[in-house]
């Protein structure tokens, strides 16, 4: 049997697809036999053939994780919880990988109370003198931090871990450090540093004796010399502990103030500072991971005035001896610029690629932010960086040019601070260093001069020099040097904002756009797509002249990127997304219903179709937004749009729920502009299927956002084709009402979803009052509906909401008294008065927003502004007015409608009854609005 099993495993990697398929099917069947799977650690996972061992280990891991909850594996599950540490103990590198995955699975799926035995066994291993036993225990502790679900209970887990083995962990790590066993030190430091990372830590770790022990251990490790790989890893985790501990101490995040006081003690903190300073002074390529934590530590110091004083004596070193040299042109960059410009550009503009420079940029900007109010210090740093540029200009030696390259980088990173605090300095840099560099002899400084220009997003008054800068930049666009072609094209963004050169720049827009598109065929550079988007936004009239051709070019380039399967990664995703956003921006800048729009749609059909047909899910949102934009702007449905629409409707439920808002917008637009064409059985069936997927699901999968999307689709159906649909198929009405009733039981009533649920029922009522009353009674929901409506009336804030309320109340007013014995007439009267009297102000607000729509947005500088955190972002629970939300109700005149009903109520109707219950004050309020000047909603 063992030989047969070996052959099956070998056949899973056979070059013959048929054999692979048969072997995989056999293994799937064998997976149902726990006895077979559990035999593998003692058979094939010990095989002499490394291929058999590896395949068997992978299969064992996957089978155990997949079947973990099945009844057939209950005994196997129990066995593994009790014996996984023993399996790991006697495993090797291959099998231990599988056992680690199972360990994480155990932590994710088993109750902590059921793992007590495992932790006690690990504690026993920690007390032995056998290194392999200790490694097994430490490895188990490390796996705790890989388990997502157990993290929610981490304080208890850490309590169990350190209550049973805390003292032994400390002693063993110290012992391994003494003996030079850095592999074990590394694992121990991972466990200790990650354990101290959390806000809530158990008593053992909170004890000052333990904390001081780990602190001194980390400090000692950081000061060790050597290039041993495990030692460097140990130092990395010691640096992590030290940085995190100092951060918690400075911010007073420790529950025990004693720990914060210990770590921030002046003498002790000075030792930490000196240690991190030594790390950056003695830096090497091997120690970059450690160095990054040192930089994080220094950034931390800039956040607090009391601790920044530690850095102040060394500011000159930080700028001139550390940051600038690492930003200066390196040998490899110089070689790439000349011989591999593709690599040079890729690394220069890859925002995620160079962690060291990114961290250094943060440190430099934080230092500038801290000293900008200290005039002498601030001016000293700026003067130093300018002197570097001046030295290169006067004596263009190789070393001076390299330093100037870095100085341009650093000055560009603080250009917003310079714009606010020292605008004259920025003007000086452009006039005296950027423009001379553009016309100079050094290609690499031309590159940096272009880079510097590309970062400035405000009008810089450099008078006639602006035209000279534009001419020189334009010449570089025609250069044969690929890097200079790209960077000079990007530098054209400077002239978007420069008034003095705006007319000349307009003439160069076609050439600039052509350069962007040509270069985008070769480079996955997001700044190119961002520049294109900016040109479209700032010069819509110029762009619209050849919009179809531009859309076609962008679509072809985007398709080529999408079809290139070998081209993967974040850069590609950002570039493709950027191009798709450019198409969307372009079509929204064109005149509605224009032929240019229709031609543009034809030219972008292929890329939208490809994304949907080939399931390029990373770009679904962009494709949906583009298609939505076309339908909304053209105001009719082009023939081929129906095919794209059907593809969207057929998306898997997981994708529809991710993009429920976009899908709802699209369906709304197709219904609005397609009208009764949507009533095609296939299309309508697919739309109703989407509604069911979004709204009629169990509570576990229910989301308010999805429910809102479904309600919006139903509302669009009712407002646009409601009568036609219900005349043809009355069974749709119960479906719509059931969506509201079932959803109302699961939504968050404090959020906006309740408004959609109530309005859905009101819309059904307006369209078919008697049938709606009957269905609500059958569902025993009529009374609840009115109670919800009255209690939630203050949430109907939008003009759209108030118009629905008035139509709904108007429909009730026409019913004969007695048709709704469940109705609280007085309560409905209050809703009527509140709605009518608040509607004029709501319309004024919406009209004002319409008038303000074209107001230019304020320019925002980011680098020295505070970043918004979650508390700064308002996520309102009340629906706010949205001028881009358009429906058939926009044309409805509500004041005349309700006035005609109330001014001469039919005898025996609810209108008569509602009026009779009103107070004189309520009647006067209504009269003032209905008989006064009527505010008309702008469309």
Curated annotation (Swiss-Prot):
Q: Which UniProt keywords apply?
A: Cytoplasm, Nucleus, Protein transport, Transport
Residue span, Importin N-terminal domain:
23-90
Transport as a keyword of this entry, yes or no, is yes
Q: What does this protein do?
A: Active in protein import into the nucleus.
Q: What compartments host this protein?
A: Nucleus; Cytoplasm
For this entry, the protein name equals: Probable importin ECU10_0620
Please give one Pfam family short name. IBN_N
Instruction: State the source organism's domain of life.
Output: Eukaryota
């Amino acid at each position: 049997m063992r030989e047969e099993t070996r052959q099956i495993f070998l056949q899973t990697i056979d070059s013959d697809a048929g054999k692979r398929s048969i072997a995989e099917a056999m293994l799937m069947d064998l997976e149902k036999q726990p006895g077979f799977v559990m035999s593998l650690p003692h058979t094939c996972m010990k095989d002499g053939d490394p291929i058999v061992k590896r395949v068997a280990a992978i299969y064992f891991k996957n089978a155990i994780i997949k079947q973990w909850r099945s009844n057939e594996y209950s005994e196997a599950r129990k066995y593994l919880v009790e014996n996984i540490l023993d399996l790991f103990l006697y495993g090797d590198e291959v099998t231990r990988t599988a056992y680690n995955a199972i360990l994480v699975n155990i932590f994710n799926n088993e109750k902590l109370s059921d793992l007590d035995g495992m932790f006690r066994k690990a504690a026993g291993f920690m007390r032995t003198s056998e290194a392999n036993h200790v490694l097994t225990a430490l490895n188990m502790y490390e796996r705790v931090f890989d388990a997502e679900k157990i993290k929610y209970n981490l304080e208890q887990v850490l309590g169990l871990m350190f209550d049973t083995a805390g003292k032994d962990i400390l002693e063993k790590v110290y012992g391994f450090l003494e003996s030079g066993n850095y592999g074990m030190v590394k694992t121990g430091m991972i466990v200790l540093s990650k354990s101290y990372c959390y806000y809530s830590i158990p008593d053992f770790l909170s004890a000052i004796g333990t904390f001081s022990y780990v602190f001194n251990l980390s400090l000692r490790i950081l000061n060790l010399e050597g290039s041993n790989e495990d030692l460097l890893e140990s130092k990395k985790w010691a640096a992590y502990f030290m940085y995190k501990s100092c951060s918690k101490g400075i911010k007073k995040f420790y529950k025990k103030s004693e720990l914060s006081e210990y770590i921030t003690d002046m003498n002790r903190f000075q030792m930490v500072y000196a240690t991190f300073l030594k790390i950056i002074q003695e830096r090497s390529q091997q120690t970059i991971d450690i160095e990054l934590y040192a930089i994080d530590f220094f950034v931390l110091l800039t956040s607090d005035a009391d601790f920044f004083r530690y850095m102040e004596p060394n500011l000159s070193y930080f700028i001139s001896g550390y940051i600038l040299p690492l930003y200066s042109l390196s040998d490899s960059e110089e070689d790439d610029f000349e011989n591999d410009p593709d690599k040079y550009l890729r690394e220069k503009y890859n925002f995620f690629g160079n962690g060291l420079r990114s961290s250094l940029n943060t440190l430099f900007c934080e230092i500038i932010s801290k000293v900008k109010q200290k005039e002498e210090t601030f001016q000293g740093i700026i003067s130093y960086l300018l002197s570097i540029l001046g030295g290169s200009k006067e004596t263009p030696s190789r070393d001076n040019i390299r330093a100037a390259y870095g100085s341009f980088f650093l000055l560009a990173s603080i250009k917003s601070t310079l714009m606010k605090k020292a605008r004259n300095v920025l003007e000086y840099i452009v006039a005296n260093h950027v423009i001379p560099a553009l016309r100079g002899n050094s290609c690499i400084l031309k590159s940096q001069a272009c880079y510097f220009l590309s970062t400035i997003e405000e009008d810089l008054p450099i008078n006639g020099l602006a035209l000279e800068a534009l001419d020189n930049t334009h010449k570089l666009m025609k250069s044969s040097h690929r890097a200079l072609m790209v960077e000079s094209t990007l530098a054209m963004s400077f002239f978007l904002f420069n008034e003095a050169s705006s007319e000349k720049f307009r003439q160069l827009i076609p050439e600039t756009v052509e350069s962007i598109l040509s270069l985008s065929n070769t480079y996955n550079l997001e700044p190119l797509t961002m520049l294109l988007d900016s040109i479209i936004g700032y010069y819509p009239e110029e762009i619209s002249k050849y919009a179809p051709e531009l859309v076609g070019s962008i679509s072809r380039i985007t398709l080529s990127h999408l079809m290139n399967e070998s081209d993967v990664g974040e850069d590609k995703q950002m570039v493709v997304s950027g191009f798709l956003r450019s198409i969307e921006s372009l079509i929204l800048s064109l005149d509605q219903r224009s032929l240019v729009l229709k031609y543009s749609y034809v030219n972008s059909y292929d890329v939208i179709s490809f994304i949907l047909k080939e399931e390029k899910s990373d770009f679904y949102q962009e494709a949906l937004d583009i298609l939505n934009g076309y339908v909304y702007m053209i105001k009719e449905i082009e023939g081929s749009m129906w095919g794209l629409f059907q593809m969207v409707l057929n998306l898997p439920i997981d994708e529809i729920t991710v993009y429920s808002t976009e899908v709802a917008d699209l369906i709304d637009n197709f219904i609005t502009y397609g009208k009764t064409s949507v009533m095609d059985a296939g299309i309508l069936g697919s739309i109703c299927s989407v509604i069911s997927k979004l709204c009629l699901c169990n509570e576990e999968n229910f989301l308010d956002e999805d429910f809102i999307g479904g309600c919006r689709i139903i509302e669009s159906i009712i407002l646009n084709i409601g009568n036609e649909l219900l005349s043809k198929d009355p069974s749709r009405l119960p479906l719509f009402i059931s969506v509201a009733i079932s959803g109302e039981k699961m939504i968050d009533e404090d959020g906006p979803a309740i408004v959609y649920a109530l309005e859905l029922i009101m819309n059904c009522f307006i369209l078919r009052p008697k049938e709606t009353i009957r269905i609500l009674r059958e569902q025993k929901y009529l009374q609840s509906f009115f109670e919800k409506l009255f209690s939630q009336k203050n949430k109907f804030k939008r003009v759209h909401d108030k118009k629905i309320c008035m139509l709904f109340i108007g429909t009730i007013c026409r019913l004969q008294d007695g048709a709704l014995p469940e109705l609280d007439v007085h309560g409905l009267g209050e809703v009527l008065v509140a709605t009518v009297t608040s509607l004029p102000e709501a319309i004024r607000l919406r009209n004002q927003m319409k008038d303000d729509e074209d107001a230019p947005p304020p320019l925002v500088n980011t680098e020295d502004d505070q970043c918004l955190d979650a508390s700064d972002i308002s996520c309102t629970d009340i629906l706010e007015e949205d001028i881009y939300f358009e429906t058939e109700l926009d044309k409805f005149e509500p004041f005349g409608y309700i006035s005609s009903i109330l001014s001469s109520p039919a005898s025996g109707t609810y209108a008569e009854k509602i009026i009779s219950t009103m107070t004189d004050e309520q009647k006067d309020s209504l009269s003032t609005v209905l008989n006064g000047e009527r505010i008309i909603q702008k469309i």
